[in-house]
Regions:
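Intrinsically disordered, low-complexity segments used for protein-protein interactions
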Residues: 1-4, 118-122, 280
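Interfacial non-cytosolic loop connecting adjacent transmembrane helices
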Residues: 237-241
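Phenylalanine-glycine-rich, low-complexity intrinsically disordered regions
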Residues: 3-4, 19-42, 57-62
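Intrinsic disorder in cytosolic terminal tails and internal cytosolic loops
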Residues: 269-289
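12-transmembrane solute porter fold
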Residues: 13, 26-27, 38-48, 52, ...
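Pocket-edge structural micro-motifs
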Residues: 19, 55, 161, 287
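Conserved aromatic/hydrophobic "specificity hotspots" at molecular recognition or selectivity sites
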Residues: 1-18, 64, 74
Length: 289
């Protein structure tokens, strides 16, 4: 075990509040594409989630041993890497949601064909993961994040210009490169963020990072799908398929803007190696004793 093990008691109220808080927000945002922002289902879910999450945070701040330590956000590097991770997950899930709508609803391809279009990206990302890990050990996460967000921004361009007869090969290549960019960001950013925390906060940081990523994916998908739907409706073109494609193009323009924001924020990354963090904590512990 890399972290100190201790017996803890489950705080039932915290479990209930966190379930309603995170669950309500996730369900609310994920339902926007189906019901719309003004739906009672969405609004009630978001309100219940927000209120429950507020009381959950208050509860954690008053517990001696909180279930989820929000103090991890006091560390600037962790906060930044977590936010960037949310942006990446929003772009990833958003693309994986909108692209099949294009291939199946607009181009009339089967679910199998769509899966084959998406498959190379998943394979390349999995294959390159250990290689990216070795690169991270040598150069750190900042350079990888800058490169990854650059790829995400550039690969948004082909999706901004989708048409009724866009090249499927180009779409496949662009999506594959997009997932390579995601792979260059996700693991290095997560590692850099966790490395910035003292050892006793690592479990809380890991849990918080995973939770925020899911929130980012849910919120990002809701926003991108909402933009796609409203833009398609406002286009009011004679051909419904052209209106749908227009909405998708607009959604990917926003996606590209998000990637540029991530690229700019990546310049502010300042990594702290784990051995330095441990030395600082050990020295503070020895001085206090």
């Amino acid at each position: 075990n890399v972290t100190q093990q201790r017996d803890t008691r489950i705080d039932v109220l915290s479990v209930i509040l966190s379930s309603f808080g995170f669950g309500g927000l996730l369900y609310g945002f994920s339902s926007v594409g189906t019901y719309g922002w003004t739906s009672a289902t969405v609004l009630i879910s978001l309100i219940v989630g927000a209120v429950s999450l507020f009381f959950f945070i208050l509860r954690q701040s008053n517990l001696k041993r909180p279930m989820l330590e929000f103090g991890v956000f006091k560390f600037a590097i962790f906060s930044l890497t977590t936010f960037l991770g949310m942006l990446v997950f929003a772009l990833l899930i958003g693309t994986e949601t909108i692209l099949p709508l294009y291939t199946q609803n607009v181009r009339g391809l089967s679910a199998l064909d769509t899966g084959l279009i998406l498959l190379p990206g998943a394979l390349f990302m999995g294959f390159l993961s250990p290689i990216i890990g070795r690169i991270f050990d040598k150069v750190g996460g900042k350079g990888l994040a800058l490169g990854g967000f650059t790829i995400l921004a550039v690969t948004s361009l082909p999706f901004m210009m989708l048409s009724l007869d866009s090249s499927i090969t180009l779409i496949t290549v662009a999506y594959t490169l997009r997932l390579i960019g995601v792979g260059m960001i996700m693991m290095p950013l997560t590692t850099a963020g966790i490395n910035s925390l003292p050892p006793h906060l690592i479990p809380h940081g890991t849990a918080m990072n995973n939770t925020m990523r899911q929130m980012g994916g849910s919120i990002g998908t809701a926003v991108l799908v909402s933009i796609m739907s409203s833009s398609a409706a406002n286009a009011a073109l004679s051909d419904p398929m052209k209106s749908a494609v227009h909405g998708m193009n607009t959604s990917f323009i926003v996606s590209g803007a998000i990637a540029v924001i991530g690229l700019v924020l990546s310049f502010f990354l300042k990594e702290k190696r784990k051995n330095k963090v441990m030395k600082q904590e050990l020295s503070s512990s020895s001085s206090s004793s």
